Amino acid sequence: MSNQILTEIHVDLDNRDKNTALFRVFLAFPVLIFLSSFSEFADNLPGVIGGFLVLPVVLSLLFRNVYPSYVLAFNKALLELSNRVSAYVLVLTDEYPSIEANQKVRLIYPEIEGGKKLSPWMPLVKWFLAIPLYLLGIVYAIYALILTFIAWLTVITKGHYPVERAEEVVKVIAYWNRLYGYALLLVTDEYPSFSLN
């Protein structure tokens, strides 16, 4: 099994709903508000970054070498929800993002054995080590947005999503998931690849 978060997104390629694709951002507004509600309190609570519980993980790994299972469950669920919303907004699927888990968008996490497989000192330097990954990730995100715009035009005019563009957009999402797993969720000590593959 990989030591990185694996991303599985089943893309709807054919028979796409042109009408919902045309107004996708507006249709996604309610679930975007729901998703953003997790980060609303992030400014007032130390250790919360974008809704993810980070400081409790850092402290528990540093002092006890334990990753609290309830924090892991929350962070997993929030990242999966974020991925379902991203898949919908980026026109990869016509299925409205469920606030519960589904099989269209699935993330597979590395086994951490309650934190025993993780170095207790790595959380202190991971954020610094991840800076080049974030910078490259911004370039990849722009690339994915350009591909999504082209694919969106294809969906609303022809009713299908080009396979090549879908694969590349999913690779960018997977890249960000690996980065989040390393630097934010702290579920791996293995440095993520700079490659999209």
Q: Which residues does each predicted region cover?
A:
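Membrane-proximal intrinsically disordered regions of secretory-pathway and membrane-system proteins
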Residues: 1-197
